[in-house]
């Protein structure tokens, strides 16, 4: 796929995201939306046995709204293990399993499959479109949830610095649970990664998402520890 064609596809997806977002706002019933805020803390360990292959384990901690005194601090924790493979420099494939423990005792199992094509616009910008298919099983409700998450992301780099900003928009589409609901929620995010050295990456990000009945603000921090056994 050449650059001009990928740009057209990316612009098409951006237009679709924008139209769906506006449609969701105009078609939603007049209900009072709740405002919620949370914090996410991520820790990942990645190992590269080959240049195009990454094995990873991760832990994500979710905290409730710290501005509400009566709210419980702990919300959920996600433990994941997976593999990321790049058959081509412009395509990434990912498969992962995630164990979730939620406040209240509910345990969930999630399987994730992703494909992410990308292309460099210039020396400083890269655009990607990621399709993520996930299945989540709730032990408490004994039910399955099938979801498709479509994300358009723009990654950048600041010349002569180890800083890498990015922005994205992501659409959550249920596949089975409610076929009449084409879009469950839409999220917009912005973040910044700091590549400290070859083995350490720090990140901070903010995400705003909205559904028919709620707004959600998420502030996150992340740390990635990387190892490799091949010569760069």
Predicted regions and their residues:
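Membrane-embedded beta-strands of outer-membrane beta-barrel proteins
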Residues: 43, 81, 113-115, 150-152, ...
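Repeated loop/turn-to-beta-strand initiation elements of outer-membrane beta-barrel proteins
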Residues: 51-57, 89-95, 122-127, 160-165, ...
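Residue-level signature of outer-membrane beta-barrel architecture
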Residues: 47, 85, 117-119, 156-158, ...
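Start-of-domain marker
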Residues: 26-84
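Outer-membrane beta-barrel "beta-signal"
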Residues: 115, 217-232
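Transmembrane beta-barrel strands of outer-membrane/channel proteins
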Residues: 57-61, 95-99, 129-135, 167-171, ...
